[in-house]
């Protein structure tokens, strides 16, 4: 892992342990059971492929470690509306709080206003996070192979599928791509 990714993962481990002290898995499962706003991310893309249309996944993020703050007056709903008005296929919402200044709440806010599938873009290292993302309305997750080992990636992938979520796997090297395709 590179230096910034190491920092993000270490912070993410701390954050997850803190959240688990206050939020039970059963509470998340109850919230998921009551939510009917889930949309099929993968199906939306496949429908475009079948109809020979391009699929655009539009990213919503406030900041990044490399770029700093991108939007001073960041309004995820306003950005999502602009993308929706321009007929994007799906949305990718960056939810990592410390380095990208995101929030899972942004997914919930967007899903209440816009009927597009939403990918939760975060640093997934624990299945608990998948339940969190789903409880806020995420339809898909991103697994970044550079941040976790292959066994954990497979566990996260299977957990997301159990929750009827789509999964996008991000690789940064040829070796990671080969592992992802196993």
Could you tell me what each predicted segment is?
Residues 91-92, 142, 168:
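Conserved beta-strand positions in the central sheet of alpha/beta enzyme cores
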Residues 96-114, 122-131, 143-160, 175-179:
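Active-site-adjacent beta->alpha loops and helix N-cap segments on the catalytic face
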Residues 57-75, 117-125, 166-171:
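Active-site mouth loops of central-metabolism enzymes
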């Amino acid at each position: 892992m590179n230096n910034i990714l190491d920092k993000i993962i270490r912070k993410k481990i701390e954050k997850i342990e803190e959240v688990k002290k206050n939020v039970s898995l059963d509470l998340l499962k109850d919230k998921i059971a009551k939510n009917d706003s889930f949309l099929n991310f993968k199906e939306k893309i496949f429908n475009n492929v079948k109809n020979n249309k391009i699929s655009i996944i539009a990213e919503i993020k406030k900041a990044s470690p490399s770029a700093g703050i991108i939007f001073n007056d960041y309004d995820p709903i306003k950005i999502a509306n602009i993308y929706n008005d321009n007929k994007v296929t799906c949305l990718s919402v960056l939810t990592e709080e410390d380095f990208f200044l995101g929030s899972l709440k942004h997914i919930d806010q967007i899903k209440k206003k816009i009927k597009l599938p939403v990918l939760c873009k975060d640093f997934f290292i624990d299945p608990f996070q998948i339940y969190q993302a789903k409880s806020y309305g995420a339809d898909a997750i991103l697994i970044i192979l550079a941040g976790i080992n292959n066994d954990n990636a497979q566990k996260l992938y299977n957990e997301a599928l159990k929750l009827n979520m789509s999964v996008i796997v991000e690789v940064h090297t040829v070796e990671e791509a080969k592992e992802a395709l196993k």
